[in-house]
Amino acid sequence: MSRYLVTGGAGFIGTNLVKQLVAEGHEVIVLDNYTSGKKPERVISGVTYVEGDIRNDADLDRVCPGVDGIFHLAALPRVPFSVENPELTHDVNVNGTLQVLLAARKHAIKRVVFSSSSSAYGGQAEKLLVEDTAIKKPISPYALHKFIGENYCRIFASLYGIETVSLIYFNIYGPYFDPDGAYALVIGKFLKQMKNNEPMTVCGDGENYRDYTHVSDVVRANILAMTSEKVGKGELINIGCGEPHTVNELVKIIGGKSVFVPERPGDVRFSGADNTKARELLGWEPTIALEEGIQQLKKEMGLVLKVRHLTQRI
């Protein structure tokens, strides 16, 4: 059994990760200020919840002693929110990540697994992005924050001997996602609109490609990244299915009416994962196809319409 700290452990991905860590018998501490996460109404038995801020040294000193590894998920997410609030999101996402790495060094914590984002790639012509060859060109503050975080992790591994791994997530969905709010993820937003008998609002022309990845696959990648002997030197590893779909195709899979609305600033055209590195270094591969994951969510939300399967794959 290991003792893990999960920053942002009350959020969407964090809650799923914490549940799995507990199921595997690990001791878990959650540090969260509940800005994006939920105060622990969804308390997981056996987990220590600490309300605090990753930018605060004293809060980190409360939770880091005796920890074997840190899953660093805490952030102010979403591209549009960062466009509207660049200073605040920089402070949390960049300075907060630096403070977590400094705390890991101070408390001699062996490994940090950092949650990055495919948005850090920026605008790319390729539909499947390769970690070590794509030249990253962030086009939003949030994307830049994650790019900086990746580089801080690499530097801390090389200069200070802190084992780090950066997992690059591609459009995650699944249980505990939040369908509410102006910055809700597209699948959650669409399913909520369907439940309310509203048309799905598609930004731009709907031909942006996204690589939708189920949160259970992301959780598995995190645990593998924490335990694999093949990583720890600041590696960048894509975590995505490798089968990008357009937003218009997503609408067809969900089923229902849609309307087009203006494109959002900061959105990239193509976002898909070449996951070869994850397979080779982590022994990871995706297990839940988009159609299956959508069907599961629709059942959870009481939506009985059946998934429509695509006739053409990308």
Locate each region found by the language model.
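NAD(P)-dependent short-chain dehydrogenase/reductase
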Residues: 126-128, 151-210, 215-226, 242, ...
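Generic anion/oxyanion-binding catalytic loop in active/binding sites
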Residues: 49, 71, 78, 86, ...
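C-terminal substrate-binding subdomain of Rossmann-fold SDR/epimerase-dehydratase oxidoreductases
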Residues: 195-314
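Glycine-rich phosphate-binding loop at the start of an alpha helix
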Residues: 76, 80-83, 143, 184-187, ...
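Residue-level signature of the cytosolic catalytic core of signaling kinases
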Residues: 43, 56, 179-183, 243, ...
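N-terminal Rossmann-like NAD(P)+-binding domain of SDR-like oxidoreductases, especially those catalyzing
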Residues: 1-172, 300, 314
